[in-house]
């Protein structure tokens, strides 16, 4: 049986490849996301991207943050072999908007901001407000779970090497 720490470090590349693939999907192919959420409007790179290049003797870390920050430095880092370790995502569905950061090494979600809900005007309304908040949290989590499940199936298929990986490389080189 694998030690948890060994397994964690051995497979963290999957989460980082997932985030890199997700950025590619955000830039080039958002239409297929509608199959996971019929009300899907958009998925955008938010206000923070962290990339890391571990191919040299020392790890190089690049952080791009701020509203309206240019992502060209991130593309340049991808060209040099970096992988995304954190990605802030803006998810829009119907008239609703979520924003959160996804960490590659563990796929932890942090700073999840959900759409605002109605306030409870009486004690009877509290249960409805709580259930609405649970639904809104779950909707963002379900999207990430479905995207990751799709990614893992794609990653172990022949399509990854024959089609998807070359498309990602082409996107990185042409940006």
Model features per residue range: what roles?
Residues 1-175:
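Intrinsically disordered, low-complexity, charge-rich terminal extensions
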């Amino acid at each position: 049986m694998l030690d948890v720490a060994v397994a964690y470090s051995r497979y963290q590349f999957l989460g980082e490849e997932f985030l890199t693939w997700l950025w590619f999907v955000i830039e080039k192919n958002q239409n297929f996301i509608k199959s996971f959420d019929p009300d899907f409007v958009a998925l955008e790179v938010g206000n923070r991207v962290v990339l890391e290049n571990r191919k040299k003797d020392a790890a190089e870390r690049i952080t791009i943050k701020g509203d309206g920050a240019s992502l060209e430095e991130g593309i340049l880092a991808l060209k040099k072999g970096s992988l995304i370790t954190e990605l802030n995502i803006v998810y829009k569905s119907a008239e609703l908007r979520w924003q959160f950061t996804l960490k590659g090494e563990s796929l932890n979600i942090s700073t999840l901001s959900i759409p605002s809900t109605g306030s409870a005007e009486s004690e009877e309304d509290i249960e409805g407000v709580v259930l609405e908040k649970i639904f809104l949290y779950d909707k963002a989590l379900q999207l990430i779970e479905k995207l990751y499940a799709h990614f893992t199936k794609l990653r172990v298929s022949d399509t990854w090497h024959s089609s998807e990986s070359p498309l990602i490389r082409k996107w990185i080189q042409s940006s």
